[in-house]
Amino acid sequence: MKINTSLKVKVWLLSFLHLLVDGICAYTVFNRLYITESNTIIVIVFIGYNTLAFLSQPLFGYIMDKIGRENIFLTISLIMLVVGSAFSLPRYLSLFLIGIGNAIFHIVGGKYSIYLSRGRLTYLGLFVSLGACGLALGTYVYKS
């Protein structure tokens, strides 16, 4: 099935947002949340972020299956990510905002990418791969 230009632009936009989301999350985790001498805090942040960002995705997928409103959830996720990363907040509030924001973004972004791609796995691969590039870029920016 052929995908039209408008849909291609939307998938590219979602993929670019994925790069930004994962880059911002990686940078924030390293730059703001791991800054400590305590190994205990590092473990709590690592487990907390990954639990919120990844293990909560089935729950948010279920919620969105029930109520829809993906555009609202996408907007909320981006706001959570900006607030959690751009403002000086307590460590665990920032952790919560970027973790949950990341989870919601991945559910909505993945659904839209699959839907908009109309069976063309190239575009789903684009969405996924730019997220991985974002992780690498966020880590690189932190280290430089």
Which residues make up each language-model segment?
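Central cavity-lining transmembrane alpha-helices of secondary-active solute carriers
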Residues: V43-M64
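Cytoplasmic membrane-interface "Motif A"-like loop-to-helix N-cap segments
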Residues: D65-L78
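Intracellular juxtamembrane helix-capping segments at the cytosolic ends
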Residues: A103-R118
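Small-residue-mediated transmembrane helix hinge/kink sites in multi-pass secondary transporters
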Residues: P58-D65, K111, T139-K143
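Glycine-rich segments within core transmembrane alpha-helices of 12-TM secondary carriers
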Residues: G119-K143
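Helical-face signature of the major facilitator-like transporter fold
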Residues: L14-H18, D22, N50, R91-A103, ...
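C-terminal ends and interior cores of transmembrane alpha-helices
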Residues: I76-Y92
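Helix-loop boundary and gating motifs at the non-cytosolic
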Residues: K2-N50
